[in-house]
From Swiss-Prot:
It comes from the Eukaryota. It is an enzyme of class 3 (hydrolase). Keywords: ATP-binding, Cytoplasm, Endonuclease, Helicase, Hydrolase, Magnesium, Manganese, Metal-binding, Nuclease, Nucleotide-binding, Phosphoprotein, Repeat, RNA-binding, RNA-mediated gene silencing. GO terms for cellular component: cytoplasm; nucleus; RISC complex; RISC-loading complex. Binds 2 magnesium or manganese ions per subunit. Belongs to the helicase family. Dicer subfamily. Residues 895-1042 form the PAZ domain. Residues 630-722 form the Dicer dsRNA-binding fold domain. Its EC number is 3.1.26.3. This is Endoribonuclease Dicer.
Length: 1921
């Protein structure tokens, strides 16, 4: 569409070409096709870029608009030519000179050059100062500085006196060069240049060549003159000539609106009134002192605004504006102090009300009456009606919009934007939001002159839309240029305005509004989409305004309509002619101008004649590129290359004329395209053809290298080339709902059974193996946890113990702890004898006893389980052993088994009757080690008690503790009608036998190993010391059980021992399997080797708040342990008195040293505590105190109040399980049993502190108070306990560590996989990244990252993990023997098992009791049913509850239930206790979506508890101990779609796991191999899983690689000691993949392109970089890497290397891994939650960008992108002001005070990118050495790592969810027009907060930050309850 001649249209026939009516169909030119792809010309580049090209090529005068990039061009030109000015001045080095007109402009230029380059800049502004300088002084200046910024006067002096000769200047920049036309120093300077033979390059900058009105002829004259004076060509920026030179011009129309007929006379009346009032104000003769405000000023302003609205828009609008102004005035009147001023304001107020009254006589203000608006308005509405979309289009267009295939495209959602910023009258409803069926077609701007016109016109259009269905589609808004300019000083008022304006613009960009009414400010510099309608409501008064507004109409079909009043139309047509002429002149000056008409006139060439098309196949409709379509293909290809939001990559085409008047073109593609060489086309007859032909040739090349697909479209990132990488698998078909790999999808898996326990039931006369279960009390329970003052019973004191009899050998596994009432007991499984046989009846006896243990002692039998040892999957015998016949060895205790068979009390209650004749006789020895059964109650399931003490001073006649009964005898008589025959017998103090069978973790610690708060320990001790609270029984009324108490105590440990054994064997099996598959480790362990003990890593992992680091003195302890852990302490050792005293003395000294210690500074404490503890925990301690002599220590330890002092200073969390315990008891905390896995298990951390890098040994010895020793592989001493020098490095990881990697946090065990998973996750990313980088040197970043994301996706990891059989081996739910443990020899009876199937409705109360389920927790020991409480306590069921303090009852079941994916109702009737003072709290509604810490709550696997719990954060007491309340999953909102079917599975043999948990497990195992065996092993492990991260080499190449290993094997493999062949071939074991051996990655060969003068270019490009190398302390061997790391994709001057994207991809993964590894190895042992937070605080773009700026990266950055230039500029300024970093905030903020308003400053992603790319460059340059990278980066990062570790920054999102877990809801993302994302967070009842950012994550955190700010601001008003 050529720009038609001016059409002056009368009102009648206004024909507009609107998109809807366009012949090209409704979608041609929809406004949101943001960048239309041009087909016949190359995509135009940014005008600043073109101007820079010109300036590099020849002397140039750049004519620009104000502020649009003069500095950009000047600074970049200086940088491009900087290689010429780095030389020594005295040896002919050159200098760059910047000339400015006045002194105050000097600083500005100086700072720009300093910010963006490392050049040294001298500034000379004052003539007075410099006049006196001598030549020498100047020479010094010139030597010191490379760029000289001077005022023109100084420069003139310097040149005239020849202090600096022109031959030493390489570039002369004239700012405001138009001054050279007049008499000005610039003119003089140019004269000097004229006479000089070699003149420097000249750059003139001017913004004011067009000021105000200007005659075209004059303008042309002026430009010519300037060109002559400056010896340059003038180039204008395209923003002065409308638009990109290429796109079609808008259709320009001038509309004559006709006169206004004032039928009602209202208009005239109002006009008169207003004129009179204004006249009056002007007449008021008030003396105004210059200092004072003019009292009439405001009034005049208001009335003249009102008059303007009346004239332009008519009475209806004048009425509206009067109403608005009255409201404004009220504010002024209220605040006005001065009488006179007030009077005028009141006058105005009255006057406006009068106007309103006048209008009301004529029309009702509520509805719009078109009689009362001006013809302009009517015309405008008419135009708008033309844009009404066709109805049918609604759907297509919305559809089309939402189906754009962009990966990052976020779907629209109904954004609930209430327009608070408009003055909407209450009755108006806010505008309807996107997506309305229409919004899509119109995208228009109406330009008006005054602010008020904009406001009222907007109101009018809204009103019209309500009344006229034709206009209903319009959704308008207004914007008045308040403080929109980028760099104006900001004040609060403006901030508010600014935010509003931003929001209006955002909506317009997002097409939520389709019409914008704007004042002229929007003409300039504001980023607005391409409009298809621009209306000038008021005519443009000068060229600039005309061009700017016209330039907004950029849609392919657009109208530029100027509304003129009849009287103005003549004069305006004149103006318009002038504007057109000026435009033409400027267009000729336009850089690279192409006469646009050529495009239109030139016929489409019949391509085949000129140049044959490129055809793929010969058939008819084969895809082809012709000479006419080629350019479009190239443009499309470039647009698809990876780039940042600021850079739109475009091809560059240069066309030159040959002497014979033919033309040839050279085409350069963007530098991140694999096709790097420039393409030269053949000579053609005209330039246009030359350009097309070269494009065609280029298409052919691109297709051949696989960059265009077979339809000749750009290949996406899912490229065919890399198929093999993606290993496209068919996802298995399952009926399971949910996306594979996500947490939402769960499946059931059988629980694994270790091979060695499968079918290993001994058979008669077949050889057997007998193992003894050794039990040694290694850490007795400390005093302050021993509330009952119970005696401790070390298991090693009695010889009778349990053994395991099997038919297969059991591999060696580490010793492990269980936690009994006596403390920590270390369990070992030792082979006693093998190869012997047993007869049938012996086996039968053993089998009967085995069943007896599980069914009667442990009461684990229930209807669902049947004892069938021959059919059971896991079958072996548990049997008692003892020292037989004086020999000192243990053997099977047959005698004991036979005795039990005979005993009467074996299963029931014996019926012995005592009478007066045969009274009961008390024998003390019978009761010393006895379990007794009361014979008078609970006959079906008698209670069993341990005898704790024999009270010889009490008899049945002693006084009964409670007043109801006189004596014990009376109590029994009254209550049970029992007579005693022996009244002298002593009484027994008894303890319940334990019903808590899960002894895997200590019950006084939560999973962090942090003491649970003890509710007022003092109170408890008192309670247990008074007789009232003891259970006292009479021997005569009890039967003695045949099993002695000592053995019973061991039997209680059996479920935990066997369960742990089972898990460790599964882990050991996995280790052996990996040894086979991956060749890492050995298949079967050496006979003399045992791994160090399983350890929870607690003793040293101190709670994250206190961070006491463990100093080296803790080594002592480990050495002691080494001795200890292999010796089973002989029983008698503990009884040697001598030792005892010595240890007591030792402790005395110790307590003394403690006191002195505490008087010193707390920091000292940090050091010595562990040393002293090490002393306590040494061997002697364990031996001697095993006997209960531990009071001493602890009392000494906590004497006095010195510890309280310590408590205020540093909150030390207990480092061991004994000292300082009651410090932490907070008064009213509930005391969970250890099964209560509060959510803190999310933080659990049991992993020992291991270093992952093999290279540098770090001090990572872990201390531990149990015998458990944690092997740290770098520490040689720690291997003492392994008799010969094996280490986990050669043998494979400790099964304990593997078990940790298999244990989910829901298992509530002492450890879980979370820390390892994080380490594995970052190593995985690193390994895959490095592999892809090295294997595909041609793939650009987009593709690499697509391949990476496919490989590391949870879905892929889940698949590999499943293939490897991990799900069965994982530990996913809490160990709860009565519910989900299958004892050996048992099978699940399918018919009866439904009680344990999840689907079954209620389990009845009886059933619960029968299974012993409610006897849960060891707390029942605390609240045994005291006989003398309430008569109704007979129902043993309530016993457990009655005695709880109220705060204990907060939860009973204390188990964290899984995500409620079975919608199983829970009847609270199980729990209805009759105790009136206890009430159940009704379950709160919990919306699981946002529970603290766990964003995906579904990770919890279902544990087996019938009462489900949720966290009630409102009761959160301390950092992360939560109170658990009941949560009834059948409520709505529980995070589960109600429709989800419940999964039914058997708890004993199956487990249900979310896919994502399996992926996590794979990562954790990787972390486990990495920490234990090193990086190479971890890579091999990945390969064996099926994730290729190493190249495969053929068998034959192996030898050759071996020789090379020493020199170039990358550093990760160096430590495999190349000298020993076996060490290097890690796969020395026969590998599963016989034919696969893995080699080492090779560094991609070329990093520089072959290029004739590559070396020279390289030196030019990196001149000055040596300073940077000094700064980072690393010197590059291959400088090309250095250049590449700093080259942005837009920097096309670099023709020799790639851009930084690939290196950034590599560096990103390297830094992530190095930082994660560093944090993981931190001796402070951060918990998983803290690790995650630290990692995200440190590995993010903001931090990287800030560091990059701090270390001057930006000064070396090479990019040609104006927007990026400005963002970096802003950011650098901001950093300088701030000089202080914030964590987590991805968008940094300007000022701290009043943060509500200040604008988030944008962090240039490119800065973070080069920070990463440099890391990648160092990695490649140093031969893949991670150490080298860390050596350079750690010093830079260290301050931040330290700062954050000491004070962990929380992500705003997490903080908000922790603050408002129930009420904060995040909306889905909404896309804004400019490609940003908006997220709204609603905090129910407290408001909605929006955040906008470049990604969902950034937006979400911005929203959360706003919400937090607001919540925190409002907090104090809440009264503290």
């Amino acid at each position: 569409m050529k720009s038609p001649a001016l059409q002056s249209l009368s009102m009648a026939g206004l024909q507009l070409m609107t998109p809807a009516s366009s012949p090209m169909g409704p979608f041609f030119g929809l406004p949101w096709q943001q960048e239309a792809i041009h087909d016949n010309i190359y995509t135009p580049r940014k005008y600043q870029v073109e101007l820079l090209e010109a300036a590099l090529d020849h002397n140039t005068i750049v004519c620009l608009n104000t502020g649009s990039g003069k500095t950009f061009i000047a600074v970049l030109l200086t940088k491009e030519l900087s290689y010429q000015i780095r030389g020594d001045f005295n040896k002919n080095g050159k200098r760059t000179v910047f000339l400015v007109n006045s002194a105050n402009q000097v600083a500005q230029q100086v700072s720009a050059v300093r910010t963006h380059s490392d050049l040294k800049v001298g500034e000379y502004s004052s003539l007075e100062v410099t006049e006196s300088w001598t030549k020498e002084k100047w020479s010094q200046e010139f030597s010191k500085h490379q760029v000289l910024v001077m005022t023109c006067h100084v420069a003139l002096t310097v040149l005239r006196n020849e202090y600096l000769s022109l031959s030493n200047i390489n570039l002369l920049v004239f700012d405001e060069c138009h001054l050279a036309i007049q008499d000005h120093p610039y003119r003089e300077i140019m004269k000097i240049c004229e006479d000089y033979p070699s003149c420097p390059r000249i750059l003139g900058l001017t913004a004011s060549i067009l000021n105000g009105k200007c005659d075209p002829a004059e303008l042309e004259e002026k430009i010519k003159k300037l060109e002559k004076i400056l010896k340059s060509n003038a180039e204008t920026a395209t923003d002065l000539v409308v638009l990109d030179r290429y796109t079609s011009q808008p259709c320009e129309i001038v509309v004559d609106c006709g006169p206004y007929t004032d039928k009602s006379g209202l208009y005239g009346r109002l006009l008169r009134e207003l004129d009179e009032a204004l006249h009056f104000l002007n007449d008021c003769n008030i003396s105004v002192h210059s200092k004072e405000r003019d009292s009439t000023l405001i009034s005049k302003q208001i009335l003249s605004d009102c008059r303007a609205v009346l004239v332009v828009l008519g009475p209806w609008c004048a009425d509206k504006v009067a109403g608005m102004m009255v409201r404004e005035l009220q504010k002024y009147i209220k605040h006005e102090q001065e009488e006179l001023h007030r009077k005028f304001l009141l006058f105005t107020d009255t006057f406006l009300r009068k106007i309103h009254a006048l209008c009301e006589e004529h029309f009702s203000p509520a509805s719009l009456d078109l009689k009362f608006v001006t013809p302009k308005v009517i015309k405008l509405l008419e135009i708008l009606r033309k844009y009404k979309p066709y109805e049918r289009q609604q759907f297509e267009s919305v559809e089309w919009y939402n189906n754009r295939n962009q990966d990052n495209y976020v779907s629209w959602s109904d954004s609930e934007d209430d327009d608070e910023d408009e003055e909407i009258e209450e009755k108006e409803k806010p505008e309807t939001n996107f997506p309305s069926p229409f919004t899509n077609i119109l995208c228009g701007i109406i330009f008006v002159e005054r602010r008020y016109t904009a406001v009222v016109l907007n109101r009018l259009i809204k009103e019209a839309g309500k009344q006229d269905p034709e206009l209903a589609y319009i959704s308008s808004n207004f914007i008045t240029g308040h403080g929109i300019g980028k760099n104006q000083p900001r004040n609060k008022q403006m901030e508010v305005e600014f935010r509003k304006q931003e929001e209006v613009l955002r909506k317009f960009r997002a097409h939520e509004t389709n019409l914008l009414i704007a004042t002229s400010i929007v003409e300039e510099g504001v980023d607005i989409p391409k409009c298809n309608l621009v209306v000038r409501f008021d005519l443009p008064t000068e060229y600039r305004s005309y061009v700017q507004s016209k330039g907004r109409a950029r849609a392919p079909i657009s109208n530029y309509i100027m509304l003129a009043d009849t009287d103005k139309i003549k004069s305006f047509e004149e103006d318009l002619k002038t504007y057109k002429a000026i435009e033409k002149i400027l267009r000729n000056k336009c850089s690279k101008s192409v006469d646009t008409s050529e495009t239109e006139t030139e016929p489409i060439v019949d391509d085949d004649d000129v140049f044959p098309p490129y055809v793929l196949r010969t058939d008819e409709n084969s895809p082809r590129v012709t000479i006419n379509t080629a350019i479009g293909h190239i443009n499309r290809y470039c647009a698809r290359l990876p780039s940042d939001p600021f850079t739109h990559l475009a091809p560059k085409c240069k066309t030159r004329e040959l002497p014979d008047h033919t033309f040839y073109s050279t085409l350069y593609l963007p530098i991140n395209s694999p096709l790097r060489a420039s393409i030269v086309g053949p000579p053609m007859s005209c330039a246009r053809l030359a350009e097309r032909v070269v494009a065609l040739i280029c298409c052919e090349k691109l297709h051949k290298i696989g960059e265009l697909d077979d339809h000749l479209m750009p290949v996406g990132k899912e490229t065919v080339k890399y198929e093999e990488e993606l290993d496209l698998h068919d996802e298995e078909e399952t009926s399971v709902p949910g996306r594979p790999g996500s947490t939402k999808r769960r499946q059931c898996y059988p629980k694994a059974i270790p091979e060695c326990l499968r079918d290993s039931y001994p058979k008669p006369d077949q050889p057997c193996y007998l193992y003894v279960i050794g039990m040694v009390l290694t850490t007795p329970l400390p005093d302050e946890l021993n509330f009952r003052r119970r005696k401790l019973y070390p298991p090693e004191d009695t010889t009778r113990c349990f053994g395991i009899l099997t038919a297969k050998p059991i591999p060696q596994i580490p010793h492990f702890p269980v936690y009994t009432r006596s403390g920590e007991v270390t369990i070992s499984i030792e082979l006693k004898k093998s190869g012997f046989t047993l007869s049938l009846q012996m086996l039968e006896l053993i089998t009967r006893l085995h069943q007896y243990i599980f069914s009667h002692i442990l009461r684990l039998e229930k209807p669902a389980l049947e004892f069938k040892p021959t059919e059971a999957d896991s079958a072996y015998c548990v049997l008692p052993l003892n020292i037989v016949d004086d020999s000192s060895t243990l053997d099977i205790d047959f005698k004991f088994m036979e005795d039990i068979e005979k005993s009467e009390a074996r299963t029931g209650i014996p019926s012995t009757q005592y009478t007066k004749e045969m009274p009961f006789i008390f024998k003390l020895e019978d009761y010393q080690d006895a379990v007794i059964i009361p014979r008078y109650r609970n006959f079906d399931q008698p209670h069993r008690f341990y005898v704790a003490d024999v009270y010889t001073d009490l008899t049945p006649l002693s006084k009964f503790p409670s007043p109801e009964y006189e004596t014990f005898a009376e109590y029994y008589k009254t209550k049970y009608n029992l007579d005693l025959t022996n009244l002298n017998q002593p009484l027994l103090d008894v303890d319940h036998t334990s019903s808590r069978l899960n002894l895997l973790t200590p019950r006084h610690l939560n999973q962090k190993g942090k003491a649970l708060p003890l509710s007022s320990a003092e109170k408890r001790k008192a309670k247990w010391e008074s007789l009232q609270n003891k259970q006292i029984l009479v021997p005569e009324l009890c039967a003695i059980h045949p099993i002695p108490a000592s053995l019973w105590r061991k039997a209680v440990c059996l479920p935990s021992i066997l369960y742990r054994l089972h898990c460790l064997l599964t882990a050991e099996e996995l280790r052996a399997q990996t040894a086979t598959d991956a060749g890492v480790g050995v298949k079967s362990l050496p006979a003399d080797f045992r791994y160090p003990n399983l350890d929870f890593g607690w003793k040293k992992s101190i709670d994250s708040k206190s961070f006491i680091s463990i100093p080296s003195s803790s080594l002592v302890e480990n050495e002691n342990y080494c001795k200890h852990s292999t010796i089973v302490v002989p029983e008698n050792a503990a009884h040697q008195g001598a030792n005892r005293t010595s240890s007591a003395e030792k402790h005395d000294q110790m307590s003394v040293s403690y006191r002195t210690l505490l008087d010193e500074s707390p920091s000292k404490l940090q050091i010595d505590v562990s040393a002293e503890l090490a002393a306590i925990n040494g061997v002697s301690y364990n031996k001697n105190l095993a006997n209960g002599n531990c009071d001493l220590v602890n009392r000494d330890f906590c004497q006095g109040n010195q510890l309280n002092y310590c408590r205020q200073e540093i909150p030390v969390q207990p480092t061991t399980s004994y000292p300082i315990q009651n410090l932490y008891s907070s008064e009213n905390q509930p005391k969970p049993s250890n099964e209560c896995t509060l959510l803190s298990n999310k933080y659990l951390d049991g992993n020992a502190n291991r270093s992952t890098s093999d290279g540098c040994p770090k001090m990572t010895v872990t201390t531990s108070t149990s015998t458990a020793l944690n092997l740290s592989k770098d520490k040689v001493d720690s291997e003492k306990n392994t008799s010969s020098g094996y280490s986990s490095k050669t043998l494979g990881p400790n099964p304990g560590l593997i078990l940790q990697a298999l244990t989910l946090s829901n298992a509530s065990d002492g450890f879980n996989l979370e820390r390892l998973e994080m380490l594995g996750d970052s190593f995985l990313k690193h390994a895959i990244t490095t592999y892809l980088f090295c294997t595909y040197p041609d793939a650009h970043e987009g593709r690499l990252s697509y391949m990476r994301s496919k490989k590391v996706s949870n879905c892929n990891l889940y698949r590999l993990g499943k293939k490897k059989g991990l799900p069965s081996r994982m530990v996913v739910s809490i160990f709860d023997p009565p519910v989900n443990w299958l004892p050996p020899g048992y099978i699940v009876n399918q018919d009866k098992s439904n009680t344990d199937k999840w689907e079954k409705e209620e389990t009845t109360k009886e059933n619960l009791l029968a299974n012993g389920k409610l006897d849960y927790d060891d707390d029942d020991e605390e609240d045994e049913d005291l006989m003398w409480r309430l008569p109704k306590e007979e129902t043993d069921f309530e016993d457990d509850f009655l005695e709880y303090d109220q705060e204990h009852i907060k939860f009973i079941d204390s188990m964290l239930m899984g995500s409620g994916a079975f919608v199983k109702k829970i009847s609270l009737s199980h729990f209805s206790t009759t105790d009136s003072n206890y009430e159940w709290k009704a379950p709160k509604k919990s919306s699981l979506g946002n529970v603290p810490f766990s964003s995906d709550f579904d990770d919890f696997d279902y544990s087996s508890w019938d009462a489900m719990c949720y966290l009630d954060p409102s009761k959160a007491v301390e950092e992360d101990d939560f109170v658990v309340g009941f949560w009834n999953p059948s409520e709505e909102n529980c995070g589960v779609d109600a429709g989800k079917q419940s999964i039914s599975y058997d708890l004993h043999t199956e487990q249900c796991i979310a896919d994502k948990s399996i992926a996590d497990c794979v990562e954790a195992l990787l972390g486990c191999y990495l920490t234990s065996c090193g990086e190479r092993a971890a890579q091999l492990f990945l390969c064996s899983l099926g994730l290729k991260v190493l190249p495969v080499i053929k068998k034959t190449d192996w030898e050759s690689t071996l020789c090379a290993t020493g020199e170039n094997c990358n550093s990760e493999q160096k430590n495999l000691s190349p000298n020993s062949v076996s060490a290097c071939i890690v796969n020395s074991e026969p590998s599963l993949y016989k034919d696969l051996e893995y080699g080492c990655l090779k560094i991609p060969p070329r990093c520089m392109f072959d290029h004739p003068d590559a070396e020279k270019t390289l030196n030019h490009l990196i001149s000055g970089f040596e300073n940077f190398e000094k700064k980072i302390n690393y010197s590059f061997k291959n400088k090309a890497y250095l250049l590449q790391a700093f080259t942005h994709a837009s920097y096309h001057y670099n023709t020799i290397t790639d851009c930084y994207q690939r290196l950034e991809f590599l560096g990103d993964a390297i830094l992530d891994y190095l930082i994660t590894k560093h944090l993981y190895e931190d001796p402070r042992q951060h918990s998983p939650g803290v690790l995650t937070d630290l990692r995200s605080a440190l590995v993010n773009n903001t931090i990287f960008a800030s560091l990059a700026v701090k270390y001057d990266y930006h000064k070396y950055f090479k990019a040609v992108s104006p927007e990026l230039f400005h963002v970096i500029d802003d950011f650098v300024q901001f950093q300088m002001e701030k000089n202080e970093m914030q964590g987590m905030d991805s968008e940094l903020r300007r000022s701290e005070e009043d943060e509500e308003k200040e604008e988030d400053i944008e962090v240039p992603k490119a800065m973070g990118d080069i920070f990463e790319s440099l890391a990648g460059a160092i990695y490649m340059d140093s031969g893949m050495s991670l150490e080298m990278v860390w050596q350079v980066y750690y010093p830079m990062m260290r301050p931040l790592i330290e700062k954050f570790s000491a004070n962990v920054p929380r992500s705003p999102v997490r903080e908000l969810l922790e603050m408002e877990p129930e009420t904060a809801k995040f909306s889905p993302a909404e896309r804004t027009y400019d490609g940003k994302v908006r997220v709204t967070v609603e905090v129910v009842g407290k408001g909605k907060f929006k955040g906008v950012g470049r990604s969902y994550r950034i937006a979400k955190s911005a929203a959360a930050r706003r919400a937090l700010r607001s919540l925190k601001a409002n907090q104090p008003q809440v009264p503290n309850s």
